[in-house]
Structure formats: C-alpha cells, structure tokens
Regions:
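Catalytic/RNA-binding core of pseudouridine synthases
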Residues: 1-149
Length: 149
C-alpha cells in the first residue's frame, strides 16, 4: 500500500555550507547527530536518554518528546550540539502504527466507520497515568490507513 508524502515546506541547501556525509569525521556525527532509538518497554524516555549520554561519554543529550515507560517506539536523541535541533522535532508531524485487539467480534464496517472519526482535527486528553502533563490538546490527523482486519 502506497502512502502519500506530506510536504510542509520546500527548501534548498547552499552547497557552500557543510560537507558530504562521506567526508565527515566521526566526531562530527557524535557532536551534531541524532540517534533514532527504538525505546523498549520499561524505562522512561529520560532513562534511555541518560544511557546514551553515559555510553557515548557526552556532556549533553536531549530526547525529542516523551514516551510513557510501557510504550515502545522511536525516541529521537540529540547528541551534544544537536540537542538544540531536537526542539524542532517536538512540533514536527509524526506517524504512528498500532495493533488493536478487540474483546468481542466487531463488524468490519463499524471499525472503518469509527476509524474515519479519527481523521482531521481531534481533541486528545492524555490518560490519568501518563508521563506528560494532562492538558486537552488539539491534533490534526492527516490520514489513517487500515492495513489488515
């Protein structure tokens, strides 16, 4: 199944700045890099961020967003000077994949109908037990795709 690419803005880079990835030193990657880490279930995002900081012997790391301890998923971790850029990821669009299990038989038409309600502008309130502040938020869901029922 093909997914449409959502472009928020187009820009070009001046070739006089920076260098090709193959010409960079490893220290450039460590001091200006972002690791897209697959956070396991269990530790907090802050703990995982601290592990990266300790393992790479860095003075500064920062993660882009918070995943609850029981949640798995991509946790972007900015290294050294790249921690400033992590703030941009917090407002960037995200894509989620989930697996649902129903406790009773539900007609496919009902699943598809309810799924459509979660496209467009939605209101979101984090659960009572959550790692983020429990404030009502507005989110835009650009598309939803059911891959298998």
């Amino acid at each position: 199944m093909k997914t449409n690419l959502i472009t928020k803005s187009k820009s070009i880079t001046n070739p006089e700045y920076g260098c090709k990835p193959e010409d960079r030193e490893i220290t450039d990657y460590i001091n200006n890099g972002v690791i897209n880490l697959d956070k396991p279930s269990g530790p907090t995002s802050h703990e995982v961020d601290s592990w990266v900081k300790r393992i790479l012997k860095l003075d500064k790391t920062g993660h882009g967003g918070t995943l609850d301890p029981k949640v798995t998923g991509i946790l972007p971790v900015g290294l050294a000077d790249a921690t400033r850029a992590i703030q941009l990821l917090l407002t960037a669009p995200k894509e989620y994949v989930c697996l649902l299990t129903f406790h009773a038989d539900v007609p496919e038409s009902e699943i598809r109908r309810v799924f459509e309600e979660f496209t467009g502008k939605i209101f979101q309130l984090p659960p009572v037990k959550s790692a983020v502040k429990r404030d009502l938020r507005t989110r835009n869901v650009y598309y939803s795709t059911i891959y298998e029922i």
